[in-house]
Amino acid sequence: RYSLWSAIGLSIAIAVGYENFHELLRGAEAMDNHFRTAPLEQNIPVIMALLGIWYNDYYNIHRYAVIPYDQYLKFLPAYLQQLDMESNGKSVRLDNRKITDYATGPALFGGAGTDVQHSFFQLLHQGTEPVPVDFIIPAVSHNEIGKHHEILLANVLAQAEALMKGKTPDEAAAELRAAGKD
């Protein structure tokens, strides 16, 4: 999980080009600096960690989805799955005592939004248990095709709003009646 920062990074630099690899390192350094210097209420890694603990321990939610709406990020959920679940998938403390008083981490899943929104989104929208979701979309597309990115952004925002607000059965029935589909 940390090997890209070591000598193995050479193979990555060769594959993506030194300038791209250097840009990755600059981004990592910027995030490290943000983590070290940002006030807690603005510290993105701290806020994300606290949300994870809150969902896991307070709400007893033991699953989490990462949905990038960009094909260049389609492997990000698998990478995060390995990083997070391997790190947190422990049942024994450093002193060899069994962990019994808290869950060590959620099951993480996901995939590229356009690929997975017709597979497990039914569970996200209508399942009986909540699933925290992080939607990711770049501000600017690397492959701008007409209005495709604008449409994709609208889709992501609509998915997020639907999950955030939802509808009661009465609201859904009223919408169907208003559309003449009762």
Please provide the spans of the model-predicted regions.
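Acidic, Ser/Thr-rich peripheral helices and adjacent loops at domain boundaries
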Residues: 144-181
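Active-site phosphate/pyrophosphate-binding segments
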Residues: 1-146, 166
